[in-house]
Amino acid sequence: MKVTFEQLKAAFNRVLISRGVDSETADACAEMFARTTESGVYSHGVNRFPRFIQQLENGDIIPDAQPKRITSLGAIEQWDAQRSIGNLTAKKMMDRAIELAADHGIGLVALRNANHWMRGGSYGWQAAEKGYIGICWTNSIAVMPPWGAKECRIGTNPLIVAIPSTPITMVDMSMSMFSYGMLEVNRLAGRQLPVDGGFDDEGNLTKEPGVIEKNRRILPMGYWKGSGMSIVLDMIATLLSDGASVAEVTQDNSDEYGVSQIFIAIEVDKLIDGPTRDAKLQRIMDYVTTAERADENQAIRLPGHEFTTLLAENRRNGITVDDSVWAKIQAL
């Protein structure tokens, strides 16, 4: 089905206010959920909202909490999210990293005791729109087996890198072949995954999203490489924030909350002039996209460039929402 941005935001806002969230906070949170969905990231927008409300009702998320600065070391700061609303706090933390970068050339904010930030790409994009390189990542509850194991002991720990090119170039990727959100999107659409995304119950690689959702044997991105990246990203976020690791979040908490996150902004213009920056970026993009195609009907893609098209289509034609997901939200 199709809904407008206004309908989507109003639905989110209604549910948030009915759960006791104050009107200003509810409006800002609903806006971010709606913007994420409008951008085409359904898995971490509308599809994720019922799960967000469940955690709000369970007390994992404290809606009136505010992040608190703990330590300041010039370009590096350490903050405690105090289990505040994840997407609103993440936006504030990237804004703070940008402020630090404006003074120092680079800014790094390490955040502990945080909640799920929903679409991580929003915060990299936020920096790139202002002319900064944006880098951020988060750890999570253990939802992926390390390479060679059957039992979940590492997080998908998504990493975002956004570049202020025209259009913005951005990688937003979990350390698994697919996020659990994308498994859900494909299952709801009745589609197999385009490539193997995990193992079935017999240990064979599979493209069936429902099987992987159930047995949790999701495949690390690049096999052992994604497994290794997940571990070191967790270590860095834990040390810099003095926060909880994947092991602590999984073993000590009743659900996925109290995670650790990193936000980095780099002011490119302190290192290179604008025309030179633009020319270098354009040469990179042209060199990549003019490669001989494996399939003449399939253009070479640059990461993140599709979001401009998806956003325009959703604004023109309405936002696609799965019927069953919309019914869940209406029933909240």
Curated annotation (Swiss-Prot):
Its EC number is 1.1.1.130. It is an enzyme of class 1 (oxidoreductase). It is found in: Cytoplasm. It catalyses: 3-dehydro-L-gulonate + NAD(+) = 2,3-dioxo-L-gulonate + NADH + H(+); 3-dehydro-L-gulonate + NADP(+) = 2,3-dioxo-L-gulonate + NADPH + H(+). GO terms for cellular component: cytoplasm. NCBIfam families: PRK13260.1. HAMAP family: Diketo_gul_reduc. This is 2,3-diketo-L-gulonate reductase. It comes from Escherichia coli (strain SMS-3-5 / SECEC). The gene is dlgD.
